[in-house]
């Protein structure tokens, strides 16, 4: 994975882990993305972050960005949060509240 898309990838993973599809319905994140029935219920924040990640990946192969660069290198902003979610060190209710808060801020 190119370092410039690492933060976007982790942001998508964190958002999917917090989504009702994973937290409440107990599907895995891949099922939530692949299944159209589950995909339509994803929070707008997750969809926006997925779009940003795909744009970043597209920028890797875009020859016009080869000289100027795709994006800033990874900052490690989501590393600790990602590790906690992967290891199960989180409170599901708290994560759902965070997702609701982030989703409502994006709509404003």
UniProtKB/Swiss-Prot annotation:
Record carries keyword Disulfide bond: yes
Sequence motif Cx10C motif, location on chain: 21-32
Top-level taxon in the UniProt lineage: Eukaryota
Disulfide bridge map: 21-56, 32-46
Pfam family, one: Pet191_N
Segments carrying motif Cx9C motif: 46-56
Family affiliation: Belongs to the PET191 family.
Protein name per Swiss-Prot or TrEMBL: Mitochondrial protein PET191
Phylogenetic placement of the source organism: Eukaryota, Fungi, Dikarya, Ascomycota, Saccharomycotina
